[in-house]
Amino acid sequence: MLTAMKLFNKIIAPLLLSAALVSCGSSSDEVDPKRPIFSPLDTTTMTDVQKYVQNYFGKKFNVDIRYNYEDRLASNLYKLGPASEAQALKYLNLMRYTFFEVYEKVAPKGFAERHTIKQLVLFGTLGYGPTQNLLGEAPFGMIQVYDINRLTIPYLGGDDLSGFNYYYERARDNYIQTLYHESAHTLHQDTPVPEAFLKLTISDYQQDNAFSYWYVRGISSLTAGFISDYASKSPEEDFAELYGTYMVLLPEEWEQLMKKADHKYKPDSRYTGREILERKLAIMKEYLKANYHLDIDVVRAEANRRICAKVNLPSAEYYKFVKDDFSMLPPSYYSTVPKD
């Protein structure tokens, strides 16, 4: 079984060693509806993949996706490379199966269309910067996901055990978790994070020192009530990281993280990190039900069912996850796409 310790090291250690690989690099995730971001596509010159994007993701889920490199959409602060269409298709199929279809099946009707990703741009490489390398960012609400060209969907029949575990963790933690993290930002933009959530760790948010603060002191941010170092950047990132991480971890993996958090950050701290995290989670659950009629545990169970795997023997559900060739257009595409 994937251990929480391995998962924690997988997420946190590379961040520190590379001066922070982070999933959300913008100081503002707010959507400006009047800001023109995309130019209309010429449908007469679309590839099959572009038609799949428009007719499935665009029309069904109200999301605008671009994967062809456009310099005007790339950050001026980071070096970015283009995503290949083959890798973009693989990512789109992964996103469809582990994200949009999860909400479509168990969330309230219309939730995915109104409260998830609206604008998505894919780049092939990491966002290479002078002090940090990014997995993605969200400038002006336009979510950007990087490193698409290195996405691999593992299959035990084709990978040895160590290779399977490595690629599985990368797919889950670097790509799927990022989708849930970023979608959480759309929720708190509509309805602010509850004040009770903010007060729990209001004095411990580190802003731009979110990574170095814990590393230099040799302290686990879990004990301070943060699910990751990056969660300590701000209340908004705290909310999004908690949402995204809780959504993709199996219950036993979550419990192992809670055991690591079951200590006090400071000798005079009133609560352990576990107590703070469990209180934050309870507040989040209440917030989601009250404002969006969303039961995060129901959504999480469906997400887990689709993406769960065990170290020694992937489950039957995981084989369902990889039974379709994610490098190909889905069969439904050919029966639904309008004929030119």
Predicted regions and their residues:
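C-terminal motif of bacterial Sec signal peptides marking the signal peptidase cleavage site
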Residues: 19-23
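Acidic/polar, low-complexity intrinsically disordered N-terminal segments immediately downstream
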Residues: 24-112, 270, 277-340
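Auxiliary, metal-adjacent structural segments of Zn-dependent hydrolase domains
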Residues: 29, 89-151
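Short helix-loop boundary/capping segments
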Residues: 179-221
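Metalloprotease/metallohydrolase-associated module, dominated by Zn2+-dependent proteases
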Residues: 205-285, 289-294, 313-317, 323-340
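Bacterial N-terminal signal peptides that target proteins for export
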Residues: 2-12
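Second-shell loop/turn segments in exported
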Residues: 77-86, 161-170, 174, 225-233
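Active-site recognition of the HExxH zinc-binding catalytic motif
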Residues: 162-194, 240
